[in-house]
Amino acid sequence: PSPPLIDAFLEYAQHTERPDGVPIIDDPVVRERLVRALIDVEVCRGFAYNTAFLAAEGTMFGVEGSMTKLFASESYKKHSKWFIDMAGSEGLLYLGEDEAPVGGLLDEHFRHAPVTTIYGGTSEISRNLIAEGLLGLPRTR
């Protein structure tokens, strides 16, 4: 997920109450998932900086790009689902609908996230490249 999406959800969770009157942000699962999402964003950033550094140095890199892409797209997919789950049924409201949390961005990202595991090479291909390049495992196909 992008940091603006995390920020938008945090704002929503701080100012929205569950049906029992407790703010969403007071739910320990919500807090843990927000922290995990932020940590994953920083891990993605580290992967990207490392890959960019290797490219700038002219170093031939192999699996670093695949690792960056795989981690980023799989994290985005996971976190987008988390945000929908944490918002409840309202999280499924479309972009622009009046009652949609975060202006409907949760649904927008949830529907877009699976595509990121396909373009630039599917997650399966990335896993195979990492298995071959980093672990020395034989090709699967």
Q: What spans do the regions from the language model cover?
A:
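Alpha-helical interface subdomain recognition
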Residues: 1-141
